[in-house]
Amino acid sequence: MKYKSLFLTSCILAIVFSSCKKCYRQNGFPSETRTGANTFGGYVDKIEFLPCKTTGGISPVKKLEASSYHGYGYAENYVDFGILAVNDCDKHYTYGRSISIQFDSMEIETNKTYKFGSRSDNSKNKVTCQYSQDLVDYNSDSTLSGSITVTYYDNSKKIMSGKFEATLKRRDGPETVNITTGVFDVTF
């Protein structure tokens, strides 16, 4: 009986502590750097977006993630590359916000500008952008304005830096959002 109550108390404490929320926020809007500082920022319809992740719960997603994959059969310089920035600390949004940028089988080069395309386009060699706010998705499209400039890319050091701007369209409606002054400096 004593072990049963000890086990029950341990379970309750584990649940309480795992649901505690502490916010890990980036310090201020980032400047343009090329050092792999793991910073990200932008303005969505003139509202600042910075990565911020609460701890607790069971979500494995970090506030800022970047990854690269060299697919089988790809030419040597072609990679899949993704950046995901999450903000679930802002109390104005029930389910939080996120920005995702995806290079799909691209040859990434320093000081090159890429136009955003459509996520629904099944072709390779494209770059896409998505903004999610309270479970509503806004996506890049080749008919809308938007581009990303890679200001620094070093696959051996695993660093990518750049800036971006885009007009994104709601997936199931006519509404749009504008992302301006987007900057990032990430390691992968």
Model-predicted regions and their roles:
Residues K21-G28:
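Bacterial lipoprotein signal-peptidase II cleavage site
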Residues F29-I47:
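Post-signal peptide N-terminal segment of mature Sec-exported envelope proteins
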Residues R34-G36, S142-L144, N178:
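Residues that act as N-cap/strand-start positions at coil-to-secondary-structure junctions
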Residues V44, A85-C89, A166-D172:
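Short acidic, glycine-rich loop/turn motifs
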Residues C52-K53:
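Short linear motifs in exposed loops
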Residues G57-N155:
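Surface-exposed helix/loop patches within compact recognition domains
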